[in-house]
Each structure stands twice: as structure tokens, then as C-alpha cells.
């Protein structure tokens, strides 16, 4: 048996560190397929639901090679041969199938075949909308994996919907925090806060000993972000209508700046984005002490590098994936 946790492709090493810290010495490893980390576990408690870099958690119980002659029958027999203690006395369940690759059957066919077999065996009613137990059958190429999904919804949905409307997930915001080495007590700025995801993730991770500032020019978005912060019990975040091109006018010195700047679609030509980067980075340089860091996302890495002022050193870069888009993460340090 093993626990599989999913994340954004490109963040597997960070999730591996988090899992290894939660379950030290148990052999966590990155899966060959992108966006997955696994660790041998026979049982998982509530502690796993506090993972900040994971979307979903699945406790897998079996792995098998599919028979070419009767693959659906093989899945049914494998499911019936396994113990399913979660189904004993459960109010409802459903089977969720995920397929990768070409197969002579569909995901609904897998769900129906395995679901009917488990229903006959345990007498538990099927509920496709809000099941008490989610049985997972993942078919990846010629292999199949059977287990139980531990998460009803993604762990990344930890804030009100208003804070999740932007392009950045809390998992990516958490990655920026870790790559910037943000620690409790540090002062943090989110200068393009939008719906507030970065600010909320920073405040909920670092706690009230860390002042968190959040700025944006859009009053409506700032209002939604404030509401989300209050609903999340993060009342110490300081929201301010501010122009990220002139940071020193609005904010005091900070230790870390975490940013998801506009990608240029609303700024017109590349020159508009270049000047935004130019002004923002010089303002960031003015706010940071030596050793202070900026962690940001960009879809225009060459443009950002061209706008980089003297006084910053590039400490880290990586590509991540979110929803079919591949932004670059940069970590800059003031010299």
C-alpha cells in the first residue's frame, strides 16, 4: 500500500520534502509520471490533510497488469479480492476511474463494472454526487491501480471562492513562499494581490508574527480579497490600493516579495510589460534589505531578465505547469 499525492508538475521536489518531513524515513519518492509523489503507507491520518503542496491524496492498495483478453473482468476480480474497510457500514460510495493512454474501454465502463461488483459485495448504495467513500481505479497504460481517494475536494481549496478566482492556486503560492525561504517573523509583500491568494497563503503559513502587505489597483478585487481574509481568520493582512510600479510610495521595508505580475495580455505590446517589470523590480530593490528575496511567476522570462536591475542575483529558476500553461518561477536576491 502507498499514499500518492498530486501537485503541479514542476513542484514534485517540494512536495517530496513536505511528505518526507511528515513521514520521516519512510521512503517517499517522486513518481515517474509528472505531478505525483508517493510514499509507502498502510494507513493515513488527519495529519496528511494539512499538506500545503498537494491537491489530492489517494491511498492505493493494489497494482496489476491488465489482461488484454478481459481487462474489465480483471479489474472487477481485483476489486473483489481486496479488503475495503471503508465500505463496511458506509452510507454511500462511488467509483472514480482515471485513464491515461489508449484502451478498449471507457472510464464510465470501468466505474460501472467495478461499482456494481462492490455494491453487490457490500450492499452500500451508490451516490455519484456526494459519496461518503470514493474508490479510485486508475488505469495508466497497461497497469491499473486500485485504492481510496482521501480528499473529497482538492486540499488547495482552503480559502473562500473569492480568493480562488485568479490564475494562481494556493499550492503555487505556497511554492513561492518556500522557494523564497519565507519564515515566521518576516515581513511579506504581495504587490499584485488580485483576489488575494498569495497574501492569504503567506498569512496562514507564517502566522500573525509576520506582517503581510497586499496591494492592487483594482478596488473590486481588493474588496474580495479583504472579505476572503476576514472569512479565513487572517485579519492582520494589510490591504492597500497601490501601484506596483511605485512600491516605495506605498509600502515599508519588507523581507520577501511574492508576485504574480500580469502576463501582458492587458498591457498591449511587449513594451508595456517590459516597463512594468522595469519599474516593479526597481521598487522591489528599494524595499528589500540585503539578502531580501523576490519570488515571482512570469510567462515572459527573457523580458523579465532584460528588465532586471543591477543589485539582484538570480538564485533559482524553474518551470511549473498549471492548467496547460507553463510559467517560469524566478527567485531573485538583493546583493
Swiss-Prot record:
One of its GO terms (molecular function) is tRNA (guanine(6)-N2)-methyltransferase activity. Monomer in solution. The gene is trmN. Residues 47-150 form the THUMP domain. It holds the Pfam family NFLD. The lineage of its organism: Bacteria, Thermotogati, Deinococcota, Deinococci, Thermales. Consists of an N-terminal THUMP domain fused to a catalytic Rossmann-fold MTase (RFM) domain. Its main location: cytoplasm. Belongs to the methyltransferase superfamily. S-adenosyl-L-methionine-dependent methyltransferase that catalyzes the methylation of the guanosine nucleotide at position 6 (m2G6) in tRNA(Phe). Keywords: Cytoplasm, Methyltransferase, RNA-binding, S-adenosyl-L-methionine, Transferase, tRNA processing. This is tRNA (guanine(6)-N2)-methyltransferase. Its EC number is 2.1.1.256.
Amino acid at each position: 500500500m502507498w499514499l500518492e499525492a498530486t501537485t503541479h508538475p514542476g513542484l514534485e521536489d517540494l512536495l517530496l520534502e513536505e511528505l518526507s518531513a511528515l513521514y520521516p524515513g519512510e521512503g517517499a519518492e517522486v513518481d515517474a509520471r509528472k505531478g505525483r509523489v508517493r510514499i509507502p503507507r498502510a494507513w493515513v491520518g488527519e495529519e496528511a490533510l494539512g499538506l500545503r503542496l498537494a491537491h489530492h491524496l489517494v491511498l492505493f492498495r493494489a497494482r496489476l497488469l491488465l489482461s488484454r483478453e478481459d481487462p474489465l473482468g480483471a479489474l472487477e476480480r481485483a476489486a473483489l479480492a481486496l479488503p475495503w474497510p471503508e465500505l463496511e457500514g458506509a452510507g454511500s460510495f462511488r467509483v472514480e476511474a482515471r485513464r491515461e493512454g489508449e484502451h478498449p474501454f471507457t472510464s464510465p465502463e470501468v466505474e460501472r463494472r467495478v461499482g456494481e461488483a462492490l455494491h453487490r459485495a457490500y450492499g452500500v448504495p451508490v451516490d455519484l454526487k456526494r459519496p461518503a467513500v470514493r474508490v479510485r481505479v486508475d488505469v495508466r497504460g497497461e497497469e491499473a491501480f486500485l485504492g481510496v481517494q482521501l480528499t473529497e475536494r482538492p486540499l488547495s481549496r482552503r480559502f473562500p471562492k473569492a480568493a480562488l478566482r485568479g490564475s494562481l492556486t494556493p499550492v503555487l503560492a505556497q511554492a513561492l513562499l518556500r522557494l523564497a525561504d519565507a519564515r515566521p517573523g518576516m515581513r511579506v509583500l504581495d504587490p499584485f494581490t488580485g483576489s488575494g491568494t498569495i497574501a492569504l497563503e503567506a498569512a496562514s503559513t507564517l502566522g500573525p508574527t509576520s506582517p503581510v502587505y497586499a496591494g492592487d489597483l483594482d478596488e473590486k478585487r481588493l474588496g474580495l480579497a479583504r472579505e476572503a481574509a476576514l472569512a479565513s481568520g487572517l485579519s492582520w493582512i494589510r490591504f492597500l490600493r497601490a501601484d506596483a510600479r511605485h512600491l516605495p510610495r506605498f509600502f515599508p521595508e519588507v523581507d520577501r516579495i511574492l508576485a504574480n505580475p500580469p502576463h501582458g495580455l492587458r498591457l498591449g505590446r511587449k513594451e508595456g510589460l517590459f516597463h512594468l517589470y522595469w519599474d516593479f523590480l526597481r521598487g522591489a530593490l528599494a524595499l528589500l534589505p540585503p539578502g531580501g528575496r523576490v519570488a515571482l511567476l512570469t510567462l515572459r522570462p527573457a523580458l523579465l531578465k532584460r528588465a532586471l536591475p543591477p543589485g539582484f542575483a538570480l538564485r533559482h529558476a524553474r518551470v511549473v505547469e498549471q492548467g496547460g500553461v507553463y510559467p517560469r518561477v524566478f527567485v531573485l536576491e538583493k546583493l
